[in-house]
A protein has these predicted regions:
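Extended, subdomain-level signal for the structured scaffold at the beginning of enzyme domains
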Residues: 1-99, 112-121, 132
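Short, hydrophobic beta-strand segments that form beta-sheet elements in well-ordered domains
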Residues: 40-43, 103-107, 123-127
Length: 132
């Protein structure tokens, strides 16, 4: 059975940031390799989420219904990681880290992670030092 990789998106998410990761997960990390993971989208609610590019995405799960058994959490960057909506993700990230899950964050989501102290003791990259 394939393990789920949960992609957290917020309104005005950067639709290009998760595309390459999701494609590799769906096709196998290397061409011809076994497909072990499946990407799933998580958002604050089950309502459609609009990307920066105008795509409307229907989440597979909302924050309240997402499974607890998953392989990794990926926070996709975007324009709303400083919003009250983003604050709802703090307990999800905290729980994932406490349970030893892999957590990735791209672009402004990395700044969100830094703001909440999640990056204090790990090597990481981000947009600019001023944002971290």
């Amino acid at each position: 059975m394939k393990q789920e990789i949960l992609f957290i998106i917020l309104n005005e998410y950067a639709d290009w940031e998760g595309a390459f990761i999701a494609a590799c997960l769906n096709a196998g990390v290397m061409p011809g390799s076994e497909v072990k993971y499946t990407p799933k989208v998580v958002a604050p609610t089950l309502d459609a989420v609009r990307s920066i590019g105008g795509f409307r995405t229907l989440p597979d799960y909302c924050f309240q219904t997402m499974p607890t058994d998953y392989a990794a959490l990926v926070l996709i960057g975007g324009m709303q990681w400083n919003s009250p909506e983003a604050e709802q993700a703090v307990p999800l990230v905290k729980d994932a880290l406490q349970r030893g899950k892999i957590v990735g964050a791209i672009c402004n989501a990395a700044s969100f992670m830094a703001k909440h102290g999640f990056l204090n003791n790990v090597k990481h990259t981000g947009n600019t030092i001023q944002q971290l």
